[in-house]
Design a protein with these regions (language model features):
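Conserved dinucleotide-binding and phosphotransfer motif residues
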Residues: 22, 124, 310
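Rossmann-fold NAD(P)-binding glycine/threonine-rich loop
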Residues: 102, 106-155
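Beta-loop-alpha module in the N-terminal Rossmann-like domain of NAD(P)-dependent dehydrogenases
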Residues: 79-93, 110-113
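Hydrophobic beta-strand scaffold residues
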Residues: 26, 47-48, 103, 128-129, ...
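Helical "substrate-binding/catalytic lid" subdomain
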Residues: 143, 147, 157, 164, ...
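NAD(P)+-binding Rossmann beta1-loop-alpha1 motif at the extreme N-terminus of oxidoreductases
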Residues: 1-63, 67-76, 96, 100, ...
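Short, well-ordered coil/turn residues at beta-beta hairpins
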Residues: 80-81, 106, 164
Length: 351
């Protein structure tokens, strides 16, 4: 398929490279055209343009000026841009798209915004797909887990794209009783979750769960990190803090990095996030290069809001969100563990 890619940063470049490796033709546009040219020279994209209008033209036709009449076929356009720029990017793209085109939003948009956008575009004859995308900077090698929302026809048209981006069936053992049965998209690492907004809704909850898991790791490693507090204990301490009953019980000088490495093998708490945590702790056991305050990008808040709207208890996710708020005041080691993980899986600037 011929695809137009808007946004060629960490995620966009990796996605483009996977698509090209699978035989697709990817033409890109980014604000930094010089960088886009460099990506073209490295064959990370099939071509680059200096404008959104030019991108639409090249996706639809290899010659001539695009009009409603001379468009050869509907175009597929992927937006991999920050949530706060989706609306402006979409508005610019809509100036040049034609009826039948498909626009895929791979960002972390609020699912309510995705529903609104899909309804708006449907009145123009343009199909909108919201695609929650997980995988971060490792997606190029591991593949991207995709949570898709939109009309059946649009999703079916774009299935070759999703198949190319997803990790594939070999990424995990098949669950019980599936051997020999028909293979489904979710076994390849992508799912058509439902109508417009469903993809971003599922991705929102995914990120809420991520908050909770990361917080549990951070708190556990913080306890290990402080396990030698008894050796530093001063009996005449703060009158507002309950005294430690048996300081001698907490005189363990535990190497947190080595514990993380051990837990990666055979432990029930093993995971990819633990792998990343072990990696960052091995490099800097005290995480001295990481800030103590942890950002929240929005999805955790949206998940808590949805839980309140639905009347569904979510104490772990809520607590993890509150902890991120508090971390920006305290700068504790637990917050540095969280930032270490975020830097590893998402390439976030947390120093």
């Amino acid at each position: 398929m011929k695809v137009g890619m808007i946004g060629l940063g960490r995620m966009g470049e990796g996605m483009s490279r996977r698509l090209i490796a699978a035989g697709h033709e990817v033409h890109g546009y980014r604000n930094n055209y010089k960088k886009a040219e460099e990506q073209f020279e490295k064959a990370y994209i099939s071509g680059c343009t200096t404008s959104v209008e030019g991108l639409v033209q090249v996706v639809h036709s290899s010659k001539g000026t695009l009009t409603q009449d001379d468009a050869k076929s509907p175009g597929v356009f992927m937006m991999v841009v920050p949530a706060e720029t989706v609306e402006d990017t979409l508005n610019e793209l809509l100036q040049f798209c034609v009826e039948g085109d498909i626009i895929i939003d791979h960002g972390n948009s609020n699912f309510k915004d995705s529903r609104r956008r899909a309804e708006r575009l449907s009145k123009m004859g343009i199909q909108y797909i919201d695609c929650g995308t997980s995988g971060g900077v490792y997606g190029l090698e591991r593949g991207y887990c995709l949570m898709v929302g939109g009309a059946n026809t649009a999703v079916s048209t774009c299935r070759p794209i999703f198949d190319a981006l997803a990790p594939g069936i070999a990424a995990a053992p098949r669950t019980c009783d599936r051997d020999g049965y028909t293979l489904y998209p979710e076994e390849f690492g992508w799912i058509h979750a439902g109508s417009a907004g469903a993809g971003h809704f599922v991705k929102m909850v995914h990120n809420g769960i991520e908050y909770g898991i990361m917080q549990a790791y951070a708190e556990g490693f913080n306890i290990l990190h402080e396990a030698n507090a008894g050796s530093k204990y001063v009996k005449e301490g703060d009158a507002e803090v309950a005294p430690m009953d048996c300081p001698e019980d907490y005189c363990y000088d535990i190497n947190v990095a080595k514990v993380a490495e051990c837990w990666r093998r055979g432990s029930v708490v093993g995971s990819w996030l633990l792998d990343l945590t072990a990696d960052v702790l091995r490099r800097d056991g005290e995480l001295s290069n990481f800030a103590g305050g942890v950002s929240d990008s929005g999805e955790g808040r949206w998940t808590v809001h949805a839980a309140v709207d639905l009347g569904v208890p979510a104490p772990v996710i809520s607590s993890a969100l509150w902890s991120r708020f508090e971390s920006r005041r305290l700068g504790a080691f637990a917050a540095k563990v969280l930032n270490g993980m975020r830097a590893m899986f998402g390439g976030h600037d947390v120093r």
